[in-house]
């Protein structure tokens, strides 16, 4: 008799994806972040669902409904801060996952990489519309400033902004549609995740060496399930520590002031995970130029597979590329820091230099270093 795990139509899919899946034996802990992202998504959907039961998407009551959740709902504050800090954890895992993909050449699986890019954009959109919902000062002004960037589009810009706003300013219509989008986008993310896994399992996982590992594979369960469980426990521990000891560490104090269209905060800035892109946006003096630089800073990742000039897939044995990769990471950290600083000297200059270096590294320096390495290895 065939094992039900291998014969049942539904169980068979789960079995082939999480139990009997042939996995390279040498994948390191950097490969844990995919499963951690899945865990983050499930946690965000669950906490978000409970928050949506008590939240009211109306300009007059949105802020007070958040206060009500924190004060009157049983463990409402826990759910709220788990959701807010869960988003930070989500982006930490997301950026690490992408960094691993860049370092080890996982982008060679183009379909998986492209679906991953779609996931990145969807998650970023979800986080942005979600940031507007508490209807605090920073929520309101971040929504106003970022959506207003659409007005830089020639000819149709102003019409487009008013269409997104649902009026002549960020108001009730905007809040309602942002809540609707914030509710539906995680489920779109969930669907895209399944497509992402589908494409990944067509080729099998990459590994640190970048060399095909068909000769040396092990079943996913129990080896990698144990490894993933360890990662999951560490993630939950970090999230709980952050939520219970420093829930407002990554938030903005301005969001504890109800939204006021007549009073602009001194420094308008998004959440920390968007600061690198915000710094690139601000470093271009021209509005349209800034918007294009912002878009390109994210969309440039789509072209990474085309910019791969190395004969080797992974950076494991390529010291020049390794040096440039870590320079890129430092550059992104610098941009993140600059994005949170006021627009004044010397931050403006540092931001402009870091922005130039970001594009220079990806478009010119890294492909050139790969070609030099090919020559040195006589390939």
UniProtKB/Swiss-Prot annotation:
Topologically, how does it sit relative to the membrane?
A: Multi-pass membrane protein
Name the residues that bind heme b b562. Answer: 83, 182
Give any Pfam family that matches: Cytochrome_B
Q: Tell me where the transmembrane regions lie.
A: 33-53, 77-98, 113-133, 178-198, 226-246, 288-308, 320-340, 347-367
Q: Which GO terms describe its molecular function?
A: metal ion binding; ubiquinol-cytochrome-c reductase activity
* Gene3D superfamilies, A to Z: Cytochrome Bc1 Complex, Chain C
What InterPro entries does the record point to? Answer: Cyt_b/b6_C, Cyt_b/b6_C_sf, Cyt_b/b6_N, Cytb/b6-like_sf, Cytochrome_b, Cytochrome_b_C_euk/bac, Cytochrome_b_N_euk/bac, Di-haem_cyt_TM
List positions binding a ubiquinone. Answer: 201
Q: Which residues bind heme b b566?
A: 97, 196
Give any Gene Ontology cellular component: respiratory chain complex III
Q: Which cofactor does it need?
A: heme b
Localization per Swiss-Prot or TrEMBL: Mitochondrion inner membrane
Give the note describing cofactor binding and stoichiometry. Answer: Binds 2 heme b groups non-covalently.
Q: Which UniProt keywords are listed?
A: Electron transport, Heme, Iron, Membrane, Metal-binding, Mitochondrion, Mitochondrion inner membrane, Respiratory chain, Transmembrane, Transmembrane helix, Transport, Ubiquinone
State what this protein does: Component of the ubiquinol-cytochrome c reductase complex (complex III or cytochrome b-c1 complex) that is part of the mitochondrial respiratory chain. The b-c1 complex mediates electron transfer from ubiquinol to cytochrome c. Contributes to the generation of a proton gradient across the mitochondrial membrane that is then used for ATP synthesis.
PANTHER family listed in its UniProt record: CYTOCHROME B
* UniProt subunit comment: The cytochrome bc1 complex contains 11 subunits: 3 respiratory subunits (MT-CYB, CYC1 and UQCRFS1), 2 core proteins (UQCRC1 and UQCRC2) and 6 low-molecular weight proteins (UQCRH/QCR6, UQCRB/QCR7, UQCRQ/QCR8, UQCR10/QCR9, UQCR11/QCR10 and a cleavage product of UQCRFS1). This cytochrome bc1 complex then forms a dimer.
The name on file for this protein is: Cytochrome b
Q: Read off the lineage from the record.
A: Eukaryota, Metazoa, Chordata, Craniata, Vertebrata
The record's gene field reads: MT-CYB
